């Protein structure tokens, strides 16, 4: 998958159009000028042309392109940008917080247009704005497209249970039998989670995962609608943007990210608006220093050379991270510059 940042603004303060928004924190050192907040179509075209000429990136794009940010729907050019990246892949998705005031919003109109062009909209559920903003528009989205991924970012198991119940109530209200498999999946998720909470409320992460058993996180419905839910633990992040080694729901466990790039396989590449690339799945952190070239500035040959150099650097750093975890030095940054939780 290619995860491409198309917008720096996170719409934390202004929900409909970008006037007084702040920049998504990990991008602050990179995008100081307001003019750089939105990716422009010309930049997208240049990226697309370069991706076509670099086989590893071309292969990742064919699998999936995820347009993200910040809040991707804030970009006034997002429909045109979607069309450009659609020439690379039949599977282009856009992630949104769906914190939108109404169907009259330009942001909403952009999302609708993307679904009409066969793009997919995925969301992160936010309970604080669920009833007033997300729920009414999600009803529309599930009629406009044939699938949905919902991310649940949880601070505790009780918080996760509340969010699962929100989804159960939502799909129970839909007067369509095709969503019954989704309810069956969510009911099973809820039952297993409740058992864990009742029997071991302060459980370790392994206990939580064992309680979930072999439960899949996705299901197919009659008519082809595919639903997936991702439960993602939340982390404390310092004002400097450094993430804790432990998650909020599982404070006793060092949270490890098993990076495939360390093992010589790139399954995801995150591309910033500046063109900088990192094979990092943790797009909320972006602190991995080994870079894989600049998609806008570097030649295909230079990029492929940097791929090899940075993979070796990451493998060395991951090895040191593992040793640090064994010797009570977890959290110490190594000279290779990969985050201390990446192995």
Located regions from the model:
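Short, flexible loop segments at the rims of nucleotide/cofactor-binding pockets, characterized by
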Residues: 70-71, 255
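A C-terminal junction/extension of Radical SAM enzymes
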Residues: 151-283, 321-341
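Canonical Radical SAM [4Fe-4S] cluster-binding loop centered on the CxxxCxxC motif
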Residues: 1-46, 280-282
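Flexible mid-to-C-terminal extensions adjoining Fe-S/redox cofactors in radical SAM and related proteins
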Residues: 24, 28, 276-277, 282-343
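Pocket-edge positions in alpha/beta enzyme catalytic cores
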Residues: 35-39, 70, 292
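Short, solvent-exposed loop/turn segments at secondary-structure junctions
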Residues: 9-11, 25-26, 72-73, 99-100, ...
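Radical SAM/AdoMet-radical enzyme domain recognition
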Residues: 41-68, 75-200
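Hydrophobic pocket-lining residues within nucleotide cofactor-binding pockets
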Residues: 5, 72, 295
